[in-house]
Design a protein with these regions (language model features):
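Terminal, non-catalytic protein-protein interaction segments that mediate quaternary/complex assembly
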Residues: 1-208
């Protein structure tokens, strides 16, 4: 927070999520770029949720929805969108619903449909990124390919406020030896995170993953 106050740059974005906010002073932001930090232990997570007492309940329900396997749904291949976790912080999330759904959910991104070599999209066939990464880490613990992308190439078509695009870029998992012990590391790259509204939740959800 001190870094943001002392070194942050003032920015005036013209769009926020899927909203046009040009000229709206409420959205003027103080921003820190290329900021890196390292957590070696989480400690008491209560400090991540000071800004909103509902956040702890929300992240627990949101995490369940994120890792839900669509193949376990009564309607096979059915992703969770919008789910019910958003109702815990309804004032934060409801404004971004479009025709009763979000432009994307993490459940859709962690277990996604795929496009074949002919450009045909197969949303009815699930590519389970969580399982693929887990299996590769077991097969090859020294891998540098255990990456789960959240921001997909097609998101570039919707920048500028046409649709919401993920604030998370990817999760990169590495198993490396530190002080004689093998440890699982996660590198979590975000293009943006509201420090008050979302940052603590993002940290906790990445840690649980």
């Amino acid at each position: 927070m001190r870094n943001c106050i002392e070194m942050g740059a003032i920015v005036r974005p013209k769009s926020y999520q899927n909203k046009n906010i040009e000229g709206q002073e409420d959205y003027i932001t103080k921003e820190v770029i290329c900021h890196q930090y390292c957590l070696t232990s989480l400690g008491d997570p209560k400090w991540l949720f000071l800004a909103d007492k509902r956040s702890k309940q929300w992240v627990e329900e949101e995490f369940k929805e994120r890792i839900h396997d669509p193949l376990d749904s009564p309607d096979k291949f059915s992703h969770i969108n919008p789910g019910s976790a958003f109702l815990i912080r309804e004032d934060v999330w409801r404004p971004f619903l479009v025709n009763g759904k979000f432009d994307y959910t993490y459940n859709e991104r962690l277990r996604f449909g795929w496009t074949d070599s002919k450009g045909i999209n197969h949303q009815d066939r699930i590519w389970d990124a969580l399982k693929a990464v887990r299996d590769e880490l077991i097969r090859n613990p020294d891998t540098r390919q255990a990456v789960i992308p959240i921001f997909h190439p097609t998101d570039v078509k919707y920048i500028g406020g046409e649709r919401r695009v993920p604030c998370s870029m990817y999760y990169d998992f590495l198993i490396r030896e530190i002080k004689g012990k093998k440890r699982l590391h996660i590198c979590y790259h975000q293009r943006s995170s509201d420090f008050v509204t979302h940052f603590g939740n993002d940290v906790y959800l990445a840690w649980k993953l």
